[in-house]
């Protein structure tokens, strides 16, 4: 994992302090950028593949990345769809890796064997590979050692439904055996999909049990497990950027495209009355969708949750 400039860490602390003083998360620290909606799969719990949002050309992708680099964001995750479908992905990764943030990369893994992953890996800090029943790739658990050879630290992303919660342990055990990490998240109920969301209390209990049994393997923070069992556990400390550069704000569940990262400063947008009104709407939302990105990113504000998330990397 690369080291960021000291000035970036100091800047992040200032933004965190500003959030604390204002008692609202004005400045986010985590962003996922869906560089494409194209995907080879049609997961039953996902609605991204149903959307027809166009992808940006490479030059506009660079503009989005520049805007992110000049913001409070300290972690950028390139996602999709499956970003491996982009033919210009190598150039995008190389460009993003030069910027002052940690670069995550998430894929369903079905195209890994067709791409120069060891070359791509030089520009990725953390490689997330989604493996579960929904992604129809459970056989990939037999290839974890291969994935580790690409270079970056790998983290297996496991989406759990109410039906698959009882068989989660065998997946976690396999990740543990190869000294890798896994982030386990519930299949939140998205618009236009069937409801596969597991009981949040049962999910919390099982993850805590497995975290204790398979030490330093599951990165899902305890703060997330607590947040999905409270009425308002979500936060705007994380944002999702659509494949056309549009920002879902305050979240992708109930938000709208209020801003586009190809047009003007993101930091200026966050200070607008429109943005503040959206954050207020999030606080008043009673949906409790359990979307991992919005319910887990309090790790940036809570030292206890931060340790819960990072300790598998630090202690193992």
What is the predicted role of each segment?
Residues 56, 99-102, 123-261, 301:
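Radical SAM enzyme [4Fe-4S]-AdoMet core and its adjacent flexible, acidic
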Residues 2-119, 123-126, 302, 312-316:
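Conserved alpha-helical substructure of the radical SAM core
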Residues 19-22, 224-228, 276-278:
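Short, P/G- and charge-enriched loop/turn segments at secondary-structure junctions
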Residues 33, 37-40, 228, 279, ...:
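Processing junctions and N-termini across compartments
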Residues 27, 248-316:
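Flexible mid-to-C-terminal extensions adjoining Fe-S/redox cofactors in radical SAM and related proteins
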Residues 45, 49-52, 201, 240, ...:
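Secreted/processed peptides and extracellular or luminal domains of membrane proteins
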Residues 52, 82, 133, 188, ...:
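Flexible, active-site-proximal loop/turn residues at the rims of small-molecule/cofactor binding pockets
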Residues 39, 43-46, 234, 250-251, ...:
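Short cysteine clusters
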């Amino acid at each position: 994992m690369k080291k960021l400039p000291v000035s970036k860490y100091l800047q992040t602390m200032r933004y965190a302090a500003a959030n604390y003083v204002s008692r609202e998360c004005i400045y986010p620290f985590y962003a996922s950028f869906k560089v494409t909606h194209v995907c080879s799969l049609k997961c039953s719990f996902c609605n991204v593949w149903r959307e027809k949002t166009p992808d940006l050309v490479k030059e506009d992708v660079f503009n989005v990345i520049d805007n992110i680099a000049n913001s409070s964001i300290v972690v950028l995750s390139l996602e999709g769809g499956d970003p491996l479908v982009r033919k210009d992905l190598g150039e995008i990764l190389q460009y993003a890796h030069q910027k002052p943030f940690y670069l995550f990369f998430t894929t369903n893994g079905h195209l890994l064997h067709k791409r120069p992953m060891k070359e791509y890996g030089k520009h990725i800090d953390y490689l997330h590979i989604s493996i579960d029943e929904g992604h129809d790739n459970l056989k990939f658990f037999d290839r974890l050692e291969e994935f580790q050879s690409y270079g970056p630290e790998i983290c297996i992303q496991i989406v759990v439904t109410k039906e698959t919660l009882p068989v989660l342990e065998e997946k976690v055990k396999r990740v543990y055996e190869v000294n890798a990490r896994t982030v386990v998240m519930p299949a939140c109920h998205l618009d236009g999909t069937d409801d596969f969301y597991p009981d949040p209390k049962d999910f919390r209990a099982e993850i805590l049990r497995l975290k204790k049994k398979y030490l330093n393997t599951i990165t899902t923070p305890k703060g997330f497990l607590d947040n999905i069992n409270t009425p308002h556990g979500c936060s705007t400390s994380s944002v999702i950027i659509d494949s056309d550069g549009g920002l879902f704000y305050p979240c992708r569940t109930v938000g709208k495209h209020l801003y586009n990262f190809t047009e003007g400063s993101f930091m200026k947008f966050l200070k607008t009355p429109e943005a503040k009104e959206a954050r207020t709407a999030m606080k008043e939302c009673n949906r409790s969708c359990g979307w991992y990105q919005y319910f887990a990113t309090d790790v940036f504000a809570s030292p206890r949750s931060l340790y819960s998330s990072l300790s598998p990397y630090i202690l193992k």
